[in-house]
Amino acid sequence: MSRKQLALFEPTLVVQALKEAVKKLNPQAQWRNPVMFIVWIGSLLTTFISIAMASGAMPGNALFSAAISAWLWVTVLFANFAEALAEGRSKAQANSLKGVKKTAFARKLREPKYGAAADKVPADQLRKGDIVLVEAGDIIPCDGEVIEGGASVDESAITGESAPVIRESGGDFASVTGGTRILSDWLVIECSVNPGETFLDRMIAMVEGAQRRKTPNEIALTILLIALTIVFLLATATLWPFSAWGGNAVSVTVLVALLVCLIPTTIGGLLSAIGVAGMSRMLGANVIATSGRAVEAAGDVDVLLLDKTGTITLGNRQASEFIPAQGVDEKTLADAAQLASLADETPEGRSIVILAKQRFNLRERDVQSLHATFVPFTAQSRMSGINIDNRMIRKGSVDAIRRHVEANGGHFPADVDQKVDQVARQGATPLVVVEGSRVLGVIALKDIVKGGIKERFAQLRKMGIKTVMITGDNRLTAAAIAAEAGVDDFLAEATPEAKLALIRQYQAEGRLVAMTGDGTNDAPALAQADVAVAMNSGTQAAKEAGNMVDLDSNPTKLIEVVHIGKQMLMTRGSLTTFSIANDVAKYFAIIPAAFAATYPQLNALNIMRLHSPDSAILSAVIFNALIIVFLIPLALKGASYKPLTASAMLRRNLWIYGLGGLLVPFIGIKVIDLLLTVCGLV
């Protein structure tokens, strides 16, 4: 689930943003945005000029200079407001997280075991390596790993999901997060971080923007904007001697107004807001990004590594068919398969019991009443089963059962090999059942491909993104599911080493790779990937290796993460196109007005037929300020984004924002000029 979305212009946030906008007028804050710093200097200069004119120290129209100065200050304030509003929305989201942090005491154990003597210490004094005991009703005081016990944990304060989760020692569910609450039982936890370094602390710092640094693309765009500003600054500086040589020197106020209207103030004023809003939108999807760089990288990704289970398929494989070996009755196979699954509580095991009941009316039997011994599945044996009387029944992967049969002096039948291949080609997973050394047949486990996933992959392909399915299945099963789902490639029988090698291979080809993971064995690959989304339900090692954490622990979220990243890049590109395009329209307003007296031929450029030179210049400056406010919703919400090829996206961008950037200023400046004239303000 996602967190409650804030209204775009929440009244309390707007008021706070206005206050922050005024505070940001401090030159120490302004110089970080070079384009708007030039506007700030121009505002200060024209303010001094208008005061000097009003006092008679300088000749000129004091009222006109004051109006220009006022609107230049408004331009700076609007740019500050856009950034402050974006930051305010992020801080509001962070405040909801701060409520989770509670000053509490923890029971620090003197020995790493349940029942050991404990000391009551403030939670904020716990250090990495300390052992604590938490029981039902307690708030977990630190991030850590469960070393003993198991408990139901309410993580809704972090994830927004109301359903409790089980945390227990061992495996991939041993990681706990400080600030979550124990609902039942108890846990002995080893703290994995020092104070101020918890997941919650990092989340708050990231969301508040305290650690926000400019991304590479943002830096490159800033350099471009600075270069354009320097060019226009030099060009404007040379205009004064030209006009003076013509016998009618242009005033400094007009030159400052010209400079401000020519430099890319629109994108300059909104650039920071776009970056902050991108991270905020990611949080709206319940994904915490460690930096803007991670969000930006998501927009540039061109290879997605997707786990099959839970991402491409529903993840709950169900027994669909019993396929007996030659000379074996199907009911005999079903009976043995059901016996081997009686104590198997996995979805697959339960489905085998149910299928045998449905097909042959075989009732469930109690393992204890049968005086049987259940053999659990392990990663080493890759099979499970039951020992009952003199019968030894096992079910498991083909390779595991083959080794088991051969170890017991038996022979794996060729016809079963054929049946295994047949099941795998159909996209199902084959489990082989054996009694003693005699192979009884194959169980087909069918996993269902998610509806609509093939269409989503087609959209990603259209965008130039390659999809690769990662699965532990054999190559035949993987190939069948890959074909059904519509992915571009697959990695079968995947191991952590194989994932890491595949990522490095794609990166060596100059591609950017995104993946998800939740286990400690995923950590090396997550650390190597350009965009690494760790599941919040995963281990501490996985979360530390990734550069994003999905609070919903939903592997499918990776596609949404890429969408948000591309939307941020699209928004930045769209507003840059619009900003540069609307500068062209402003040339036709200001240049004829500023120099018509010196060079009458320039009147031919006054295609908007503006009322007077003063109204033309003032209208352009007013429009230049107002357009920032009108574009704030676009900067915060993001430009509309559709899965298109790069060339189609460029054409769409140029038509909407390029042509729009040309037309909107012509209309806006003309309307403002008419209003100023009608109201008698010029």
From Swiss-Prot:
Give the active-site positions: 307
For binding ATP, which residues are annotated in this chain's numbering?
A: 344, 348, 377-384, 395
TM region(s), chain numbering: 34-54, 62-82, 219-239, 254-274, 588-608, 616-636, 656-676
Location relative to the cell: Cell inner membrane
List the Gene3D superfamilies hit by this protein, alphabetically: Calcium-transporting ATPase, cytoplasmic domain N, Calcium-transporting ATPase, cytoplasmic transduction domain A, HAD superfamily/HAD-like
Major subcellular site = membrane
Asked whether the UniProt record includes Membrane among its keywords, one would answer yes
InterPro entries cross-referenced by the UniProt entry: ATPase_P-typ_cyto_dom_N (IPR023299), ATPase_P-typ_P_site (IPR018303), ATPase_P-typ_TM_dom_sf (IPR023298), ATPase_P-typ_transduc_dom_A_sf (IPR008250), HAD-like_sf (IPR036412), HAD_sf (IPR023214), P-type_ATPase_bsu_IA (IPR006391), P_typ_ATPase (IPR001757)
What keywords sit in the KW lines?
Answer: ATP-binding, Cell inner membrane, Cell membrane, Ion transport, Magnesium, Membrane, Metal-binding, Nucleotide-binding, Phosphoprotein, Potassium, Potassium transport, Translocase, Transmembrane, Transmembrane helix, Transport
| Catalysed reaction, written as an equation | K(+)(out) + ATP + H2O = K(+)(in) + ADP + phosphate + H(+)
State where Mg(2+) binds: 518, 522
User: One GO CC term of this entry?
Assistant: plasma membrane
Annotated GO molecular function terms are: ATP binding; ATP hydrolysis activity; magnesium ion binding; P-type potassium transmembrane transporter activity
Q: Any keyword Magnesium? A: yes
Report the leader peptide range: none
Membrane association type: Multi-pass membrane protein
Q: What is its EC number?
A: 7.2.2.6
Please name the CDD domains in this protein's record.
Answer: P-type_ATPase_K
Q: So what does this one do?
A: Part of the high-affinity ATP-driven potassium transport (or Kdp) system, which catalyzes the hydrolysis of ATP coupled with the electrogenic transport of potassium into the cytoplasm. This subunit is responsible for energy coupling to the transport system and for the release of the potassium ions to the cytoplasm.
**Similarity field:** Belongs to the cation transport ATPase (P-type) (TC 3.A.3) family. Type IA subfamily.
* Quaternary structure, from the entry: The system is composed of three essential subunits: KdpA, KdpB and KdpC.
From the Swiss-Prot or TrEMBL record, give the protein name: Potassium-transporting ATPase ATP-binding subunit
The species this protein belongs to is Escherichia coli (strain SMS-3-5 / SECEC)
The encoding gene: kdpB
